[in-house]
């Protein structure tokens, strides 16, 4: 027999609900959501992972790692840059990218560890 994944009656803990609703007003969930959305694209997740493996990569390196055009890699990198996931700098004719900070590396590594532990339905 399959278990229902919903409550069979409607009730809630008013104290918990009020406390958590108040907490939600004090944090930038929308900003967090935007960061996670940026990384959620498979190519951008690959870029993030690649930058976890090497401190700095140029656009050409990333394009070759992903097997995409430089224009496509640049598009994904711009999205990641706008969300603060990656940093960018120019060195001569090279456009070099690195992770925005250690938190991004941690997010990626934790997500990979979590994926190994649970079965994710796609």
Curated annotation (Swiss-Prot):
Pfam families given in the database record: HTH_5
SMART domains listed in its UniProt record: HTH_ARSR (SM00418)
Limits of the HTH arsR-type domain: 24-119
Single Gene Ontology MF annotation: metal ion binding
Origin: domain of life: Bacteria
SUPFAM superfamilies reported for this sequence: Winged helix' DNA-binding domain (SSF46785)
Gene this protein is translated from: cadC
Summary of subunit composition and partner proteins: Homodimer.
Record's protein name: Cadmium resistance transcriptional regulatory protein CadC
Organism of origin: Staphylococcus aureus
Job of this protein: Metal-binding repressor for the cad operon. Involved in resistance to heavy metals, such as cadmium, bismuth, zinc or lead. Binds 2 metal ions per subunit. Metal binding to the N-terminal regulatory site causes the repressor to dissociate from the DNA.
DNA-binding region ranges: 59-78
Additional notes on this entry: The N-terminal, regulatory metal binding site 1 has higher affinity for cadmium than for zinc. The second metal binding site has higher affinity for zinc and has no regulatory function.
Lineage: Bacteria, Bacillati, Bacillota, Bacilli, Bacillales
PANTHER family named among the record's database cross-references: ARSENICAL RESISTANCE OPERON REPRESSOR ARSR-RELATED, HTH-TYPE TRANSCRIPTIONAL REPRESSOR CZRA
GO BP terms in the entry: response to cadmium ion
Keywords of the record: Cadmium, Cadmium resistance, DNA-binding, Metal-binding, Plasmid, Transcription, Transcription regulation, Zinc
Binding site for Cd(2+): 7, 11, 58, 60
Binding site for Zn(2+): 101, 103, 114, 117
């Amino acid at each position: 027999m399959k278990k229902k994944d919903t409550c069979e009656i409607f009730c809630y803990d008013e104290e918990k609900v009020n406390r958590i609703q108040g907490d939600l007003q004090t944090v930038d969930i929308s900003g967090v959501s935007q960061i996670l959305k940026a990384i959620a694209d498979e190519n951008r997740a690959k870029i993030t992972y690649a930058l976890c493996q090497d401190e700095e990569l140029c656009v050409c390196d990333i394009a070759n790692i992903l097997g995409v055009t430089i224009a496509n890699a640049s598009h994904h990198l711009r999205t990641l840059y706008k969300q603060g996931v990656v940093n960018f700098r120019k060195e001569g004719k090279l456009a070099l990218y690195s992770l925005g900070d250690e938190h991004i590396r941690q997010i990626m590594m934790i997500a990979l560890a979590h994926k190994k532990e649970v079965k994710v339905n796609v």
